[in-house]
């Protein structure tokens, strides 16, 4: 079950606090909130302090908006998901994504657009939070900062990856030539032909456009008094 799929109903009942248990997509998101796992996490999901958190929205080819918690993107990162088998995902968790990613990291950049401007990118990501397992995509990003965090990853082959991986693993905020990040309220990612798109790690139908924005404070989530 992907947590983001159930957020539409929660969003319609604004004002009702949401408790999160750390499994699947919720596990990645809960780490950004500093939520514990196990019994402590279950107790916090029932009794934690309600705090306002942002919610991401994405529209593919002008279709109905879909909510997300962690990140969405167009390009090679979404293609990686084609190689993630469900049985491996259940058995290995996020390691299954890393394993599949090794098969796409060496592929060349794609012709894409950001807000109508032509670019070449391995992928373009838009995130609501900053951290994923083993790395920080958007250092300093918080789930309640009211901002959309965008990454243009312009690697083109294996050699370009090493400084990018080092930047992610050291949680560095410094951008490099192949890695550009910025904050905004809205971004439109486009392509002349349908490209792979993912939403919180779930592969979606290939699309020519991916419009993304943040709804600040849209969710009430039970947390600790402060976010780590």
Regions from the PLM with identified roles:
Residues 88-95, 136-160:
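Gly/Ser/Thr-rich active-site loops/lids in small-molecule metabolic enzymes
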Residues 116-118, 142, 152-228:
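ATP/nucleoside-binding phosphotransfer catalytic cores, i.e., glycine-rich phosphate-binding loops
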């Amino acid at each position: 079950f992907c947590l983001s799929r159930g957020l539409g109903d929660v969003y319609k009942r604004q004002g009702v606090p949401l408790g999160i248990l750390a499994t699947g997509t919720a596990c990645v998101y809960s780490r950004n909130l500093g939520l514990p796992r196990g019994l402590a996490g279950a107790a916090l999901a029932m009794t934690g302090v309600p705090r306002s958190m942002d919610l991401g929205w994405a529209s593919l080819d002008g279709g109905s908006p879909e909510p997300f918690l962690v990140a969405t993107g167009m390009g090679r990162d979404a293609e990686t998901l084609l190689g993630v088998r469900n049985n491996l995902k259940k058995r290995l968790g996020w390691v299954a994504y890393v394993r599949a990613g090794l098969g796409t990291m060496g592929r060349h950049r794609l012709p894409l657009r950001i807000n109508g401007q032509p670019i070449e990118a391995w992928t373009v990501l838009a995130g609501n939070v900053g951290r994923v397992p083993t790395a920080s995509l958007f250092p300093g990003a918080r789930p309640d900062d009211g901002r959309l965090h965008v990454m243009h990853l312009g690697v083109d082959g294996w050699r370009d990856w090493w400084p990018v991986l080092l930047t992610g693993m050291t949680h560095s905020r410094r951008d490099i030539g192949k890695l550009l990040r910025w904050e905004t309220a809205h971004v439109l990612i486009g392509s002349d032909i349908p490209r792979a798109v993912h939403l919180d790690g779930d592969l979606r139908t290939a699309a020519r456009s991916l419009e993304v924005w943040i709804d600040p404070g849209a969710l009430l989530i039970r947390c600790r008094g402060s976010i780590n």
